[in-house]
């Protein structure tokens, strides 16, 4: 309700009431952050407290990641990022489409947030004898390696604070971690200050598609 009122008040002509418009804009941004925080808290609570649904599908990874790349290009238009996608069109993984969508989009959105102008973001998917892997790499701010073990904790903020510099709920990587756990997978983080970061999702061989099944994507 509050968000609706604020959006209505924002229709006031800025030239007429500049100070009011500025204050309402700030209030609207705060309401959006609160809305995002509540959404992420509810999602994380569900991931932590419920068992994975037995109904799983063969998710079309290329289609999902290509859509996210297009969204990222739109979001980062003013930063002129180079966003590369290296994903085989036949790539599929058995899982929960909505959960995987949340995990992958969190990683790509983070890369957009923490990569400076004209930076490069690389999204790559590959398979080997160990399973399937998705990496999202950037040449952005980077993180001091001593913080890496705690990055998937709720609300954890490194000293150089990628989060405080760019906003965010502080729950994104916790969500990624729990989605991967529900898919028998894991998250690997490599980073160095000033050199960027690489976040890699690892899925075991049993998550690869080996026979016909329902497809989502």
Where are these regions (language model features)?
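Short helix N-cap motif at coil->helix boundaries in the Bergerat
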Residues: 61, 142-153
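Short alpha-helical segment of the dimerization/phosphotransfer core of two-component systems
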Residues: 26-34
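Conserved glycine-rich
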Residues: 184-185
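Short helix-loop "hinge" at the ATP-lid/N-box region of the Bergerat-fold HATPase_c
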Residues: 111-112
């Amino acid at each position: 309700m509050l968000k609706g009122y604020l959006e209505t008040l924002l229709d006031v002509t800025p030239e007429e009431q500049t100070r009011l418009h500025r204050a309402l804009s700030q209030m609207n941004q705060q309401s959006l952050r609160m809305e995002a925080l509540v959404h992420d808290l509810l999602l994380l609570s569900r991931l932590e407290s419920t068992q994975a649904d037995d109904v799983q599908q063969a998710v079309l990874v290329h289609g999902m990641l290509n859509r996210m790349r297009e969204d990222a290009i739109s979001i980062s238009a003013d930063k002129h990022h180079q966003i590369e996608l290296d994903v085989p069109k036949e790539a599929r993984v058995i899982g929960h489409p909505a959960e995987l969508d949340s995990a992958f989009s969190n990683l790509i959105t983070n890369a957009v947030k923490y990569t400076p102008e004209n930076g490069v973001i690389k999204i790559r998917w590959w398979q080997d004898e160990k399973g399937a892997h998705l990496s999202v790499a950037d040449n952005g701010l980077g993180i001091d390696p001593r913080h890496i073990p705690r990055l998937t904790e709720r609300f954890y903020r490194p000293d150089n604070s990628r989060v405080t510099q760019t906003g965010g709920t502080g729950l994104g990587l916790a969500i990624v971690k729990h989605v991967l756990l529900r898919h028998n997978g894991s998250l690997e983080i490599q980073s160095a200050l000033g050199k960027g970061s690489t976040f890699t999702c690892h899925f075991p061989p049993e998550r690869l598609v080996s026979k016909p099944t329902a497809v989502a994507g």
